[in-house]
Amino acid sequence: MLGKYKAVLALLLLIILVPLTLLMTLGLWVPTLAGIWLPLGTRIALDESPRITRKGLIIPDLRYLVGDCQLAHITNASLSHPSRWLLNVGTVELDSACLAKLPQTEQSPAAPKTLAQWQAMLPNTWINIDKLIFSPWQEWQGKLSLALTSDIQQLRYQGEKVKFQGQLKGQQLTVSELDVVAFENQPPVKLVGEFAMPLVPDGLPVSGHATATLNLPQEPSLVDAELDWQENSGQLIVLARDNGDPLLDLPWQITRQQLTVSDGRWSWPYAGFPLSGRLGVKVDNWQAGLENALVSGRLSVLTQGQAGKGNAVLNFGPGKLSMDNSQLPLQLTGEAKQADLILYARLPAQLSGSLSDPTLTFEPGALLRSKGRVIDSLDIDEIRWPLAGVKVTQRGVDGRLQAILQAHENELGDFVLHMDGLANDFLPDAGRWQWRYWGKGSFTPMNATWDVAGKGEWHDSTITLTDLSTGFDQLQYGTMTVEKPRLILDKPIVWVRDAQHPSFSGALSLDAGQTLFTGGSVLPPSTLKFSVDGRDPTYFLFKGDLHAGEIGPVRVNGRWDGIRLRGNAWWPKQSLTVFQPLVPPDWKMNLRDGELYAQVAFSAAPEQGFRAGGHGVLKGGSAWMPDNQVNGVDFVLPFRFADGAWHLGTRGPVTLRIAEVINLVTAKNITADLQGRYPWTEEEPLLLTDVSVDVLGGNVLMKQLRMPQHDPALLRLNNLSSSELVSAVNPKQFAMSGAFSGALPLWLNNEKWIVKDGWLANSGPMTLRLDKDTADAVVKDNMTAGSAINWLRYMEISRSSTKINLDNLGLLTMQANITGTSRVDGKSGTVNLNYHHEENIFTLWRSLRFGDNLQAWLEQNARLPGNDCPQGKECEEKQ
């Protein structure tokens, strides 16, 4: 009896312990048991054992593998049955690359075949997946919700880039919402439609109708798409609402063996470059899956520009597109034309690799060429891009990159540029691209040839220009010739394109030989050195200095912010004598003394143009020439330049002070002030004021000259010495003494006059003495005038009055009335001399033969006064 109790107790313990043991070891035996029903070569793995709670079955982690490839990874799954089956899953990750590794198995005869049979097997179930991830398309992840019954199956998917809501009732599929964000910063593509599914779910819907609305990037108009099909054929039409011609028209047919798009048409009228063409695609054996389908087709592109029409054709296939190893040959041939530019292409290539990471390899003979006109004045004779061996992947471009450019500009000249480099998985800010470049050309306007050469690389986010040398054999413009100017790198230019710590730095040097001027001036060899330091080429600081021999250095610094250039320039104080090489030797001018310094602030921007302001100062300047000297020159130039106009004298007038000018006559204490706008306007005139010169024992004054001029500027002559004037001119025919004054109304923009109604008059007694030889010669040559000439051998002038007019052609008109007393051989007589003279002053100024002209006039116009006064008496002239 005791043995029976023991047996019963052992059986009870076995009944209790075996289920508990199985439950505690689910992670060990469930994968093995499930492998009986899984496809051959696949398995499941549990990193944590499932557990059963009051709420249901919890599976913390489950992986489904095809060989060593993880097809699915499920975490935080729970299965319960409140009113129907409820499956909640935290995350499901699917790797599309593993689908190609699933083994091919024959369908079981007992398996359901029709859609209705499959639907009848569905239990009443809710399935919620918080995060469904498709690799390698992680950006399309979202939340999936399913509500399943045998009558209706509902699906809802919510992601950042895609939203879907639809239901399947029998064979009728209704899509009530499909929103896809196809382009960044653009509204989503929206689609709704109804479809009839086939009786056996082994193909596409047997009929359907769908409409979609989308926005094209950078285009304001909406686009409508409509898809219709019935049985084995259909059509997709895409229309822009503001354009009657379809953007896409694809009629298609499908059979169990082949999918065909025949005579498809497309057009793209946007971006100022209209495109259109035809499309044909054939997919054989499509039902066998992507791995076994054979794809081929043809895409034509028609372009039109000022150079005519262009046609290019892309042929692809036959080949396959595979999730593992695609093999699809491609070839693009033909030409494209836009405006005056023509692009020629012959690009054989091979598309290989997986669809998740494809590789496009250009084959031998791949060449891209172009010619035509890019801008109005630049003609591209030919540009060539050999592409053989170049590979393009998601990681970037790999291979040798070359370019050869031949071009000319009708006025500037022609040039040839070469570029050769090696790319290694290069994309902007990723990978590496090393290059070198060289070239040469002509610069016709300055009768020069130039060359350029350099090296650099783009490695990840860093662009480095390691070598640069470019220059001209000469620059010849007008009267100037610059010998061998050349720009080189003193320090590599490095641009770090890092979002957190960007930088841009480098240093350059512009060196030139002598600058020669046809007049004989020579600027010594010059050097401009400058450096940049900043964030990127649109925001940096710069500084530098310019010097030529002993001239300079002129120091410059500033900044560029991508819109506005700001800076300052300083010319330190230095002797005026350093500019001696700039003085032509023919001038025989010797710069003896003086100091010069200047300071300028400047800015430049597209809207405001170039602006500058500052001042320049010359102190104690002195220059000597064989015939004259200029000493004590002080010049102060405050200025501002904006909107194409100079504003002179911003905080005070432009001032000129010259201590003395020694020439035929000596001028001292020369002063002048200038203030205003140039070019001048009525609202902002230009004023020349306080002009004063001490000369000929008196002075010349002008209070104000206003431009634009409405009134003449009055040039006053005060007590000028006629004897000093005659001594300076040094005529041999006569001599004068005494002072004279006058006023000359000066016009600069009058239609006719330079001086109108000017006058001269004696300020006191004056004397006129004719040279004896001159008087004797006149008497000898003209007996009639001889007696009158004798009265002018010596004359004391008591009153003189001269009216002066000068027109803008240079014609000087003088009308003089002179009254005086002649004293000859102890006799005296009153002389009344009326003098009228016309001569082109420009010609007279060139000849400077005033004395000879006066002698000729005296011969023709001298006359005896009336002899009504007894001999030996002083008589007054009758009025």
UniProtKB/Swiss-Prot annotation:
Disruption phenotype: The single mutant does not exhibit growth defects and does not show outer membrane permeability defects. Deletion of tamB, ydbH and yhdP is lethal.
Spans within the Cytoplasmic topological domain: 1-6
Cellular location(s): Cell inner membrane
Superkingdom in the source lineage: Bacteria
Pfam family, one: YdbH-like
Key words of the record: Cell inner membrane, Cell membrane, Lipid transport, Membrane, Transmembrane, Transmembrane helix, Transport
Keyword DNA-binding: no
Topology with respect to the bilayer: Single-pass membrane protein
Main location: membrane
GO cellular component, one term: plasma membrane
Periplasmic face of the membrane: 30-879
Transmembrane segment boundaries: 7-29
Function according to Swiss-Prot or TrEMBL: Involved in outer membrane lipid homeostasis. Interacts with the outer membrane lipoprotein YnbE to form a functional protein bridge connecting the inner and outer membranes of the cell. Likely transports phospholipids between the inner membrane and the outer membrane. It would provide a bridge-like structure that protects phospholipids as they travel across the periplasm.
Subunit description: Interacts with the outer membrane lipoprotein YnbE.
Protein name as catalogued: Probable phospholipid transport protein YdbH
